[in-house]
Each structure stands twice: as structure tokens, then as C-alpha cells.
């Protein structure tokens, strides 16, 4: 993965998966106060710190806690956090560090990270991706397949997408609200469960839920 600077966290049970599927969680970017902090292992180090009993609590960890509650459907003990994170892959899409905590990546930074993203898909072959935030989802590569929507508990339709690896392996994508601020774990748990239930038969899903396709150039 020569274009990947920020290496993903890959849980020790990733290939066993979540509900039997390889699940990739995708954030947008890393904020680094100093460029010397932008090391390749930063993603791995952040996730490992979440269930380190000796690590002090910091406010940013609430984001990861709320997301994992939306995935599991309940609060987790420290050991349950370790088990859950070891069943998934976590990757931040943008491969350049941002220099401000509320600074958005530029269009060039998003597009400059496309090749690395596809390298991750080819290497780790997730079955499904949960993407954090509308801005990230709207800036993902727009080649691939638009699938039918997932319906939220309040009747809202949530668009889903899919990519294919070079050998035709399907990777489906669900965008969720970024799990910070006004994020309801219970609401998004229902959405995620609806999405994951479509993964039981990927061939049937692709033919049944396919909406439109855009060729990857």
C-alpha cells in the first residue's frame, strides 16, 4: 500500500468479522498539532488507546464510544470495547494531516487520497464500510454503484453505495451521522442493523438493491 500514509487499525479478529462480515469503519481525517505527530501508526495508536485501562479519559474518546454503542446496541465494558474493536478495521480517508481541529479537508486532499483508499479495499477486502459523516461520504470517489436506500426508524431514506475490487468483490458503504455532538446511538444502531442485514448474501444484494452504476476510470 505505497500510497497509504496513515495505516489502518486492523483488529486481531477482523477476518472473523462482525456478524461474519469484514467491517471497515471509516473516519475523515487526522488533526495533528505538529507534523511530527503525523506518523503512520497514529490510527492504530488512537484505537489501541481506547481500551487501555491505564490511559486517561480525553474528550475525543466520546466519539468512538458513541459509535461503538451504535454498532453493538449497548454500553460496553473496557474488555467488551477491546473485543469489539478487534473485530473491525478503522481507517481515516484523508492521507494528509489537518493543522486545525475544525478545518475541513480541501477537494485536492480528498481526491489525493482516492488511490490509497482503493489500495486499502484491495488489500483488506471489507464486505461493508460505515462512513462517518455526510461530508466524508459526499467526497468519496463517485465511481461504483448506487444501491437502494436503507430506511431509518423515522422513515428517512439513507443512500448507500458500493465499490468493486478488481476481481469483482463487492464493498458496500453506509454513511452515518458523524458520532460526535448530537448523535443518537440507538437511532443509528437500527440503521446499521438494517444495513448489515443486507450483507448476508452479497450477490443477491447487488442484483436486488442496485440502483445505478458509474464506471471507475
Description of each model-found segment:
Residues 117-134:
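Proline-aspartate-enriched helix->loop->beta-strand connector
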Residues 2-15, 65-77, 109-119, 156-158:
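A Trp-anchored, charged/polar loop motif used as the substrate-binding/catalytic surface
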Amino acid at each position: 500500500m505505497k500510497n497509504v500514509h496513515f495505516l489502518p487499525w486492523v483488529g486481531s479478529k477482523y477476518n472473523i468479522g462482525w456478524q461474519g462480515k469484514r467491517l471497515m469503519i471509516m473516519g475523515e481525517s487526522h488533526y495533528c498539532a505538529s507534523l511530527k505527530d503525523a506518523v503512520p501508526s497514529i490510527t492504530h495508536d488512537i484505537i489501541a488507546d481506547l481500551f487501555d485501562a491505564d490511559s486517561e479519559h480525553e474528550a475525543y474518546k466520546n466519539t468512538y464510544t458513541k459509535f461503538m454503542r451504535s454498532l453493538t446496541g449497548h454500553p460496553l465494558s473496557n474488555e467488551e470495547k477491546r473485543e469489539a474493536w478487534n473485530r473491525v478495521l478503522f481507517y481515516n480517508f484523508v492521507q494528509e494531516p489537518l493543522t486545525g481541529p475544525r478545518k475541513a479537508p480541501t477537494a485536492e486532499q480528498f481526491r489525493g487520497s482516492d488511490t490509497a483508499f482503493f489500495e486499502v479495499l484491495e488489500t483488506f477486502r471489507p464486505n461493508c464500510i460505515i462512513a462517518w459523516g455526510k461530508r466524508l461520504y459526499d467526497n468519496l470517489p463517485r465511481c461504483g454503484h448506487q444501491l437502494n436506500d436503507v430506511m431509518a426508524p423515522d422513515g428517512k431514506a439513507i443512500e448507500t453505495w458500493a465499490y468493486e475490487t478488481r476481481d469483482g468483490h463487492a464493498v458496500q458503504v453506509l454513511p452515518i451521522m458523524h458520532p460526535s455532538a448530537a448523535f443518537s446511538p440507538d437511532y443509528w444502531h437500527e440503521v446499521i442493523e438494517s444495513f448489515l442485514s443486507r450483507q448476508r448474501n452479497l450477490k443477491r444484494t447487488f442484483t436486488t438493491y442496485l440502483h445505478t452504476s458509474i464506471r471507475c476510470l
